[in-house]
Structures are given as C-alpha cells and as structure tokens.
A protein has these predicted regions:
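N-terminal small/polar loop signature for handling phosphorylated ligands or for N-terminal nucleophile
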Residues: 84-117
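Amphipathic coiled-coil/heptad-repeat helices and related helical stalk/stem segments
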Residues: 106, 132, 467-470
C-alpha cells in the first residue's frame, strides 16, 4: 500500500515554486545571505516562527531571548527550521499612557507577519499581561498552527521575613506611606523586594492569570503556565514546545480546533477558581471574537459566578507563583473542576491529549494552596456582571471581597449584599491625585470613589486606575479601602473589590458622564444592579447638557485606535479586525511582492 502524498507546506509557496521561478529565486537568495542554504529552504521541512516578545523594553519577558535558544533546539531536533522575529513590545509597568494600546497594535503587527511571511507554524512567547491575549488574538485571526510558551512568574518576593507579591505589595505600601508609617525610601525598598528575579508578576495578576487561561484553553503544553522563570523546567518546557510545534504543523492542527466554544467555557471556570485578574473577561472575549466564537459577559455570569475560589494566591489569598507551581499549577486546579463536573473534558489541546486525559491524575500536592472543590477557600468567587439605570454592564471580582468590606458595606440587617453611598467623582487619575485629600470633599466611609474618562476611547486604551486609595486622613484612621467605580480597569494584582469596565464609557456618552459629586448610588449585589438615585427628568436634563470631554490624541496610533476600538464589554477590540477570521485559509496565499 503506497503512502499518501506528503502535504505541501505553506512555506514551499515561497521557497520552492517552479511556476514562479523568479519569485522563488528572490525569496531563497535573500534568506541565504545570512548563512542558510538552498537545501534547507527547499527541503520541505516546516519553517517555524518564534514570535519574540522579549526585549530590553519588556523586562518581564526578557528571558525569552535565552529561552528561544531552547525552542530552536527543539524545532531543529523535530526536523523544523526556526525563524525568530520581534513582536511590538508590551510592558505593563512602564508603557504610558497604558499598555492596552499595545495589545491591539502588537496583535495587528503579528497578524501581518504570520500572514505575509513564509511560516508554517509559530511559537508564541508570552509573559507580561497583554502579550498573551495579543498573541492568542493573532493566532485566532490567522489560524496558523500555533503554541504558547509562557516565560513564567518570577520567584517569590520577601521583605523582612514576610512573603510579598509583585504589584499587590504596591497597594499595601502606598497606604503605609500615606499613613506615615514608612517614608519614600522605605516604600521603594518594600516594593522592589517583591521582584527578585526574571519573570512576570509572581501574584495571580493578569500575567499569571492569562498564561493559566492559555493553558486551560489547550494552547500550551500541560504545566507550562506556572513554572517559575528561573527554574530549569522552564528551559525544558521551551525545548518540548519547539518540538511539539513541528508535530502540530505536520498534523495540520490549528487554533480553531483547540479554541472552541467549550474550551472558552473551561477557561471561564478556571478563571473563577484561580481568583484570576479582572482583566481576564475583556481579554478572553477578545480572543474568542477573533476566533469567531460567540462569548459575552453573560457567559462569565452564567458559567463562572458560582465557581468557588480554589487557589490561595495573592491578591485573593496568601501564596505566590512558586507555591502555586509546586502545588500542581493549572492541571491540579482543573482536576478539581473535573471532579465537580465543571469541565468539558473532550476539548483538544496542543499536546495531543484531551483536557480530561491531562487533568484526570493531576492531584494537588498542597491543599493549603489549591483547595478541594468541596471545601474551597471561598464560595461563589467568580465575576458578577452588573447593570443599572446609567450603564449597560460592568464587572466586580468577588474573590477579593474580604470580610472587612463585607462587614462594612454588605451586612446591614434586612439589606444584606447592598449599600448606598455618596459619589465622589474624578475626571481621570490626574484629578484624583490632585483632589483626593481635599477636605472640602468631606470623604468618609460611606462614600464611593468614581473615576471616568479612563475607558478605551477616553484615556485612550483604558487605564488601570479604578482601584483608588482613600484620603490619607481615612487611612490614618484605619480605613484602607473604599468602594470604587469607573469606566476603566484596575491592576490584576489589586485586591480592591471595585466595579470596573463600565460600558458604555463616559467618553462616548455613557451615563457615567452624567454623575456628579454628592449624587447617591445604590449598589445591590442581589439584583446585580448599580443605580443612580435621581429621577428620570433630572437624568434627561443632564443628558441634554452633556458635551464630550476627550483629551486630544498624542500620537497617530492613539487617533486611529480611538476611531476603531470598541468597549471593554466586548473585548476592547479593533472592531473592523473582528470581521477577518482564519485569514490564512480563507483569503488564500498573499500576492507576490514583485
């Protein structure tokens, strides 16, 4: 019986196409000029891209520059040819005004590279917050065989004998400084001690959360998300990832076969169990939209709200990335969900095994870090989706609602899980910093801090500024948090139980633009509503008087972004881009360049 003819790889349309000999010669000779051979290029071996997100500008991902060597070794040993290329940098901690602008820009650039260059598959190097969604969005749009390689979290941080987490310690330290308990030098010493090595945040912030969800989706090898960056297993994972991408190419396994509706539902359940970042809903919705999968905030409410918190990691718990990894990481969390019947077990993964096969024997080694489903750290720990008479949707992360907040705001007899508060409204973070300590505002414990103009259009990009600290005077009295609300986001490392991502945002005429300081708001978690307590006539009067207040764009990309971007409720996508699905298969090969 004769073997089936070998499938012609995509790269061969560049490097070995006798029907277009002139173009083939042009493509081949330029890749030969740095030492590659015609034999290699025309061998029919898979050409594998390595999407390099590491650079001096992206410290959380910088070690990918070294890890890429292990990826290349794996690719070569599996018979492939590696080609490394840079991705537009995304550095959450240093990009101004916000790295959210870079998520969509890096996505666009990566789509063009994967579509327009002679690549048969790609290893997506991820780490810092928005590198993961940017890469997965591009993988979804192109549907080129792809696999995710996380760079992993940094080692656990310690300060004066205490475990401290990157990002999370910042919010604690700023309160200590406001209370006069530490000075600037003490603040800097404390916060920098949280980051002792290469890698992304060691807390369950956006970076670790999104890499965990990439694994839950099936787009990385089992255990990939949680291996700390300096561990030897991280290099071993890089090598295995390089080998596996070649197999995915030869078997023609594509993201559309992995990132199905059921896989996204699994990821939502995992996010709740992790106590994942509040940035996960818009990122996961964006990936799904580019994959052509219907996913909405209603799905987060329906699938994830009643899932318990299983992972005892900061900011919702007390441990960090090393403890999470040693306790079993993502597979151990999914094992608990599997036992509880909360997983689609037949979902395919890039490993070649189903989710059910991977997690069936993945027992945790530490039940103080990964709790059993039947005895969780907290019940009903997912995101709740809110609406009201001045907005359509917002989210609140229930895993970080602590006992102090619940006692103060959610425990009034006869009105449990609801409260009224006086609004203090700020026009962006500059206004907040300028006025938060103004005695004339008379801010007390029954106030809610409101910030607007920080959404996708207004900022632009949506800023992580909703988790606002109380005035220093209150902090000195022991009141270290107030309810917060806004049309922007907050850091995934924050333990603030804020009402976030309010859509539509103020800048596009959302009702948040109508709020005034001293208005009263009623927050009711039973009905999942936040209502402005003014009558309809007053609401209409304010709407007639409203005029847009959007600061000018500072760069060409900001201007273009504002014209094309949607709201956080639908993923903050560039809306025209969501119309282009699986472009490599559906649009045919790119036209020749000469």
């Amino acid at each position: 019986m004769s073997e089936a003819p070998k499938r012609r790889l995509r790269s061969e349309h560049w490097f070995n196409d006798p029907a277009h000999a002139d173009m083939t010669a042009l493509y081949v000779e330029r890749y030969m000029n740095y030492g590659m051979t015609r034999e290699e290029l025309q061998s029919g071996r898979p050409i594998i891209g390595i999407a390099q997100t590491g650079s001096d500008l992206t410290p959380c991902n910088r070690h990918h520059l070294e890890l890429a060597q292990r990826v290349k070794a794996g690719i070569r040993d599996a018979g492939g040819i590696p080609m490394e290329f840079p991705v537009h940098p995304i550095a959450e901690q240093s990009r101004r005004p916000t790295a959210a602008l870079d998520r969509n820009l890096a996505y666009l650039g990566l789509v063009e590279i994967l579509h327009g260059y002679p690549l048969d598959g790609v290893v997506l190097t991820t780490g810092c917050d928005k590198t993961t969604p940017a890469c997965l969005m591009a993988a979804a749009t192109t549907d080129l065989p792809a696999i995710v390689l996380s760079g992993g979290p940094m080692l656990d941080g310690h300060h004066k004998g205490e475990l401290i987490g990157s990002g999370t310690v910042l919010w604690h330290a700023r309160n200590l400084m406001a209370a006069g308990e530490i000075d600037y030098e003490g603040f800097m010493d404390m916060t920098t001690a949280a980051s002792p090595s290469v890698g992304h945040c060691n807390t369950m912030g956006t970076a670790l959360s999104m890499n965990a969800l990439a694994e839950a989706l099936g787009m990385s090898l089992p255990g990939c998300a949680s291996i700390p960056a300096p561990y030897r297993e991280r290099g071993q994972m890089a090598y295995a990832t390089g080998k596996r991408i070649c197999e995915l190419v030869l078997q023609d396994i594509r993201p559309s076969q992995i990132m199905t509706r059921e896989a996204f539902e699994n990821a939502i359940a995992v996010a709740s169990a992790l106590g994942a970042s509040s940035n996960c809903p818009p990122h996961l919705i964006a990936i799904a939209r580019h994959m052509g999968v219907e996913l909405s905030l209603d799905d987060w409410q329906r699938i994830g709200e009643d899932v318990p918190l299983l992972v005892n990691c900061m900011p919702a718990g007390k441990y960090l990335g090393e403890g999470f990894h040693r306790a079993g990481g993502v597979p151990a969390v999914m094992h608990e969900l599997q036992k509880a019947g909360r997983l689609h077990q037949d979902c395919a993964t890039v490993s070649g095994k189903t989710i059910g096969e991977i997690v069936s024997s993945a027992l945790t080694s530490n039940v103080d870090v990964i709790y059993p489903f039947e005895n969780p750290l907290k019940h009903r720990a997912g995101f709740i989706v809110l609406s009201g008479n001045f907005f359509d949707s917002a989210i609140m992360k229930m895993s970080v609602v602590g006992e102090a907040f619940r006692k103060t705001y959610l425990s009034e007899p006869g009105a449990e899980n609801s409260f009224e508060a006086r609004a203090i409204v700020f026009e962006g973070p500059e206004d907040y910093h300028a006025r938060i300590d103004d005695p004339a505002l008379d801010i007390d414990e029954r106030c809610i801090l409101v910030i607007r103009g920080v959404g996708t259009v207004g900022y632009p990009g949506s800023a992580e500024v909703v988790n606002m600290a109380p005035p220093a005077a209150l902090i000195k009295q022991g009141i270290d948090s107030l309810p917060c609300l806004g049309d922007g986001r907050q850091s995934g490392t924050s333990a603030s139980p804020s009402i976030l991502n309010m859509s539509p945002e103020a800048a596009v005429g959302g009702g948040l633009a109508l709020l005034k300081t001293n208005d009263r708001l009623k927050v009711d978690l039973n009905t999942r509503t936040v209502n402005l307590l003014i009558d309809e006539a007053e609401m209409n009067r304010r709407r007639r008087e409203w005029t847009p207040n959007i600061p000018p764009s500072q760069t060409p990309w900001q201007e273009l972004y504002r014209q094309l971007v949607g709201q956080l409720s639908t993923g903050g996508c560039l809306e025209p881009a969501t119309l282009h699905l699986r472009v490599i298969a559906r649009s045919g090969e790119p036209r020749h360049s000469h």
